[in-house]
Amino acid sequence: MVLVTGATGILGRVLVLELLKKGKKVRAAKRKSSNIEEVKKSWLFYTADAERLFEQIEWVDVDLWDLDSLRAALDGVEEVYHASAKVSFHPKDAQEMLRTNVEGTKNMLYIAEEKQVKKFLFVSSIAVLDEVNENGIIDENSQFNPKEEHSGYAQSKYLAEMEVWRSSAEGMNTIIINPGVIIGTGNWGNSSGELFTTFEKNSFTFSGGTAYVDVRDVAK
């Protein structure tokens, strides 16, 4: 059994789909307020077999601060894909991001260790990587530089990574990935999908650049 957190998010929903296509049994964690029908609708952009695959999902409501809720969600689970996160670059959301991204991850790891999960994959972000290589590119060897200024989101993801590294040092099999801005189909009004409508309505240019990645590439 595989548990995917943030299963209704831009990455989580496609990750669930890819795992099901590989024949995995998937338990998908969501909030009580999540709209799973919207997830199924978005799958129509990715597969012609959306209805059949969607019926195979075991949905479970999870509260990252309720340890009993996490124990129930992780019961019988061998692999965890922790894609749940609060994403914001507004200062007012800094404390909420610390609570969700750091404390929530810490709780997930605690119960995963208790349940002897065999693999824990944490979805971090390119936002925590600062140092570039000799070609001026951020790569797998790039590190977080605490002397540089960072957004509250980047700080929360870095601190969450430290919790994952702690679990790794204690013997858990962990993986951290750091994707760029994830772009997906079928979520035009949410998450990074808003970029398309924003650029369409307000044509402008800006200096510099950033890293974008197709959600299907991240999920695979």
Please identify what each model-predicted range represents:
Residues 24-35:
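Conserved glycine-rich Rossmann-like NAD(P)H-binding loop of the short-chain dehydrogenase/reductase
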Residues 25, 94-95, 99-152:
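Conserved Rossmann-fold NAD(P)-dependent oxidoreductase catalytic core, especially the SDR/UDP-sugar
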Residues 44-45, 50-100:
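NAD(P)H-binding glycine-rich loop region in Rossmannoid oxidoreductase-like domains
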